[in-house]
Amino acid sequence: MKKLVNFHKEPRPRACDLVAAWPGIGNLSLIVTRYLREKLAAEEIGEIEPFTFFDPIGVMVKDNIVETPQFPEGKFFYWHNTAGKKDILFFISDEQPSYKGYELANFILDVSKKFKVQRVYTFAAAIAKIHHTEQPKVWGVATDTSLVAFLKKYDVVLRGRLQIAGLNGLLLGVARERAMEGICLLGEVPSYTTRIPNPKAALAVLKVLLQVLEIEIDLSELAKIAEESDQQMKRLAAQAMGEYIDRYTRPVWPPLEDEGEFEDEEEEEEE
């Protein structure tokens, strides 16, 4: 393990939860996790050696000089809960590996055992047929029926059957393989906004997470960002509507150039 991760500090908690995040649709997982980490002032304690899990696919060039290959970062952070409840171990990664996701998920859980992690939390986007002005709902899934019953205490939609792509879902599958508790909270995002960050959905997820973890942080900054993002989503909604009209509708009258030709023909007949 020490060859794959470098720890600057190794806390020894009595009990801990893991909050892990990788990039995904709407950047939801990273927004939730980074915001929570920053507000809790969680301390960076280590990072993984990326060579085992990632392969560079190119290089950057600056002033006509090729730079050395760059690897994505995957860092661990730690927050001590002074209220006497469970601490939080964070893992945040810049990228998802192309083909070694299963190995990385197992490795993250190996590290988690070292910190006495009892439950794993991940987050993802749920693409839904909603308008960006609607309040997004939060869906929930878990690794066993007792946790599903636990989620019923909160404002969470239990959809029953769905698929979670990438490490934000795979980590929970591996957690179940290893008989570890795990919960994934998914925020609804409109289908036409999947390519941009969605702080509004992230805010909805974070509100539920804070209730589950029984901790409090200031959400005003994220709420302001979510409000500002509505303008960008409004433009995307208009664009999506225009594309829909172009693709699925036809004009009920002839094009203007056709009308002109028809009028010319009439004039010739009159002569």
Where do the model's predicted regions map?
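Short, solvent-exposed amphipathic alpha-helical segments in soluble enzyme
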Residues: 34-38, 106-109, 200-203
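A conserved C-terminal secondary-structure "cap"
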Residues: 193-271
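Fold-independent oxyanion-binding glycine-rich loops
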Residues: 21-24, 92-95, 123-126, 187-188
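Catalytic cores of processing enzymes, dominated by hydrolases/peptidases
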Residues: 129-210, 248-251
